[in-house]
Amino acid sequence: MSGTAGSGVGAAGSVGSVVRRFLAEYGSGTSSRLKVLDAYLLYVMLTGALQFGYCLGVGTFPFNSFLSGFISAVGSFILGVCLRIQINPQNKGEFQGISPERAFADFLFANTILHLVVINFVG
């Protein structure tokens, strides 16, 4: 047995310190543009989780509606993550020919196509 098999208080303290350090570094080292995008991603993720929870709890009676909403949430999340990767200054070397404005225009175009497909699927 290792020496770490003691009480869980030390582990909880270290998890708390990791969370505090993450929040401090995220607050100081992340641009406001990325923070807004992260808030959007959190909203879309929670929307998809809520829809999935509703599906498990209540049912999927209008199945096309459930699938459309869930596909919209998942697709929007994926497109948002792609946008975040492209506009992150740390990834500038990988996306040299793409400006943040171009990445946002691509995001809007892909989101429009996604939602046209979703609306078509609803019927």
From Swiss-Prot:
- Asked if the Swiss-Prot or TrEMBL record annotates the protein with the keyword Membrane, the reply is yes
Superkingdom classification of source: Eukaryota
Q: Which UniProt keywords apply?
A: Apoptosis, Endoplasmic reticulum, Membrane, Transmembrane, Transmembrane helix
Give the Cytoplasmic compartment stretches of this protein: 1-40, 84-102
Keyword Zinc listed: no
- Pfam families, per database record: DAD
Which GO BP terms sit in this record? apoptotic process; protein N-linked glycosylation
Pathway field of the UniProt record reads: Protein modification; protein glycosylation
- The residues that cross the membrane are 41-61, 63-83, 103-123
Residue ranges annotated as Lumenal topological domain: 62
Q: Name one GO cellular component term.
A: oligosaccharyltransferase complex
State the annotated membrane topology for this chain: Multi-pass membrane protein
Subcellular compartments: Endoplasmic reticulum membrane
Query: Tell me, what does this protein do in biology?
Result: Subunit of the oligosaccharyl transferase (OST) complex that catalyzes the initial transfer of a defined glycan (Glc(3)Man(9)GlcNAc(2) in eukaryotes) from the lipid carrier dolichol-pyrophosphate to an asparagine residue within an Asn-X-Ser/Thr consensus motif in nascent polypeptide chains, the first step in protein N-glycosylation. N-glycosylation occurs cotranslationally and the complex associates with the Sec61 complex at the channel-forming translocon complex that mediates protein translocation across the endoplasmic reticulum (ER). All subunits are required for a maximal enzyme activity.
Query: Assembly and interactions?
Result: Component of the oligosaccharyltransferase (OST) complex.
Protein family membership: Belongs to the DAD/OST2 family.
PANTHER family in the cross-refs: DOLICHYL-DIPHOSPHOOLIGOSACCHARIDE--PROTEIN GLYCOSYLTRANSFERASE SUBUNIT DAD1
Q: What is this protein called?
A: Dolichyl-diphosphooligosaccharide--protein glycosyltransferase subunit DAD1
What is the organism of origin for this protein? Gallus gallus (Chicken)
Starting at the broadest rank, the lineage of the source organism is: Eukaryota, Metazoa, Chordata, Craniata, Vertebrata
